[in-house]
């Protein structure tokens, strides 16, 4: 279960697109004297023409209010299929807002992330990633690269966190789950269309640096977990997506809490510490009038140490917005 939560916890997944190295071209080792290798190309998720219409989703929404400030808290599913969700109380709240705030602003041109990837994702120590994997995990990496049309050495010079993220996102895309359908992308497009202010709680570089701050062993643990569970993604994804679509916060809470049991340190890094930071940001924003629509990964609004519980410690109460079905 951690494999998807690892990507789903970050807005980076919503804006991330892999590079465009030609399929079948080996990535050379990186060194300070030569350009960083490009990761294998990411396939674009394509809807199945004969697929049945996807069900309408009713994800959870919260609100924090005082006399002159309203802050909506919307939990997103960063990588999503084409099911409709931008309606009902979510659309009403967004339309009433004058500012959109994301974990990280989604760049209009995903290629703009390339310099950041080159700065942080390359292992310049000279170590080869396959040399650090067991024979079974090396074979799993080769199998994972095959659908991308990438050679076995495509990730030799990349850090484990980047390989984990890339494999998770591309595997999701092969299931028709894409950042193109994700709430961050759709909300950003809607905000730009009405010239709405867009802010961020962290930013792409901050999130990349957080990935990069994990210890080497933590990164390797995530990569091993990813390689050993990619084939289970359809079964892993289904309950998470169902809980999000139904606004079932209790089920999401069980999933998030279970994901943190094996590595409390990573759970604190990805969830607890960031949730506390965001609660403090909201406290400061409540001092100024206006209406703000905050969209962050749903896992941050579901775990036992979620943003709402952090807000309670600061004296603010987040209440669930009732679902009201409207014609659409």
Named regions from a protein language model:
Residues 4, 87, 275-279:
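Short, well-ordered alpha-helical scaffold segments within catalytic/effector domains
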Residues 2, 34-37, 315:
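Intrinsically disordered, low-complexity proline-rich regions
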Residues 49, 53, 58-270:
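Structured, acidic catalytic/metal-binding patches in enzyme active sites
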Residues 24-68:
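N- or domain-start disorder-to-order transition segments that initiate the globular core
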Residues 264-328:
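A cross-kingdom marker for long, charged
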């Amino acid at each position: 279960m951690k494999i998807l939560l690892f990507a789903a916890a970050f807005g980076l997944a919503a804006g991330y697109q892999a590079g465009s190295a030609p399929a079948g071209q080996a990535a050379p080792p990186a060194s300070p004297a030569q350009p960083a290798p490009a990761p294998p190309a990411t396939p674009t998720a394509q809807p199945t023409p004969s697929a049945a219409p996807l069900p309408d989703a009713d994800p959870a929404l919260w609100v924090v209010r005082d006399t002159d400030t309203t802050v909506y808290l919307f939990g997103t599913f960063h990588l999503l299929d084409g099911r409709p969700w931008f309606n009902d109380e979510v659309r009403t709240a967004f339309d009433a807002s004058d500012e959109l705030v994301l974990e990280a602003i989604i760049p209009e041109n995903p290629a703009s992330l390339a310099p950041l990837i080159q700065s942080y994702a390359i292992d310049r120590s000279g170590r080869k990633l396959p040399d650090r994997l067991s024979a079974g995990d090396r074979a799993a990496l080769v199998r994972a690269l095959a659908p991308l049309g990438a050679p076995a050495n495509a990730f030799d010079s990349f850090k484990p966190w980047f390989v984990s993220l890339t494999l998770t996102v591309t595997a999701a895309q092969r299931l028709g789950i894409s950042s193109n359908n994700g709430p961050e992308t759709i909300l950003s497009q809607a905000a730009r269309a009405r010239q709405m202010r867009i802010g961020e709680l962290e930013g792409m570089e901050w999130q990349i640096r957080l990935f990069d701050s994990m210890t080497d062993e933590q990164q390797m643990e995530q990569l091993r977990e990813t390689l050993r569970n990619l084939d289970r993604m359809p079964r892993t994804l289904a309950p998470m997506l169902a809980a999000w679509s139904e606004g079932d916060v209790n089920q999401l809470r069980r999933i998030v809490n279970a994901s943190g049991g094996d590595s409390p340190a990573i759970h604190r890094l990805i969830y607890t510490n960031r949730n506390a930071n965001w609660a403090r940001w909201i406290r400061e924003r409540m001092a100024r009038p206006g209406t703000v629509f905050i969209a962050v990964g749903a896992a941050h609004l579901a775990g036992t140490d979620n943003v709402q519980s952090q807000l309670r410690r600061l004296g603010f109460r987040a209440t669930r917005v009732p679902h009201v079905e409207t014609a659409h």
